[in-house]
């Protein structure tokens, strides 16, 4: 088995699904945003504000290369922009958690939105969502309809890997 990599826009449920998959498959879960935050000593928002998005993306790209060297399979929950990196291919079997923009925004309360610097302006966020959707689909091994909730998404992934 290869790494199972969850991609999708912020708020699509990648972190929650990763935890459930980890339990179901008895695999370690890695979260790229969390790893970067711990290494840098700042939240994702803090990295964006103090070091800039370009530096965050560099950390992300380097982490992808590092994760490719792991010998055992993991569940990898990624940040929403990870699909912008050309080195994502080959990391593992990729699952795109697809959800419409309006549902994503409803799922995120104000406190959650404040943690996500790219959601400060919803008009810009929708444009970003539309641009990234193409990249998510291009990078996906499988597309998961994430509108049905966590259990439904879990069932879909487990069916694909059975």
Curated annotation (Swiss-Prot):
Keywords: Amino-acid biosynthesis, Aromatic amino acid biosynthesis, ATP-binding, Cytoplasm, Kinase, Magnesium, Metal-binding, Nucleotide-binding, Transferase. Its main location: cytoplasm. It is found in: Cytoplasm. GO terms for cellular component: cytosol. Binds 1 Mg(2+) ion per subunit. ATP binds at residues 11-16, 116. The keyword rRNA-binding does not apply. SUPFAM superfamilies: P-loop containing nucleoside triphosphate hydrolases (SSF52540). InterPro entries: P-loop_NTPase, Shikimate/glucono_kinase, Shikimate_kinase/TSH1, Shikimate_kinase_CS. One of its GO terms (biological process) is chorismate biosynthetic process. Its EC number is 2.7.1.71. Monomer. This is Shikimate kinase. It comes from Helicobacter pylori (strain Shi470).
């Amino acid at each position: 088995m290869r790494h199972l990599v969850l991609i999708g826009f912020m708020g699509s449920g990648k972190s929650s699904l990763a935890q459930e998959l980890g339990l179901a498959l008895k695999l370690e879960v890695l979260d790229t945003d969390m790893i970067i935050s711990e290494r840098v000593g700042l939240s994702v928002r803090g990295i964006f504000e103090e070091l800039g998005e370009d530096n965050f993306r560099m950390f992300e790209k380097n982490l992808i290369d590092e994760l490719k060297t792991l010998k055992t399979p993991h569940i990898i929950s990624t940040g929403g922009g990870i699909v912008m990196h050309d080195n994502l291919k080959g990391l593992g079997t990729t699952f795109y958690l697809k959800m419409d923009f309006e549902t994503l925004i409803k799922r995120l309360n104000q406190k959650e939105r404040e943690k996500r610097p790219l959601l400060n302006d919803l008009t810009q966020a929708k444009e970003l969502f539309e641009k990234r959707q193409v990249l998510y689909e291009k990078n996906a091994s499988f597309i998961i309809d994430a509108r049905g909730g966590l259990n439904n998404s879990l069932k879909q992934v487990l069916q694909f890997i059975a």
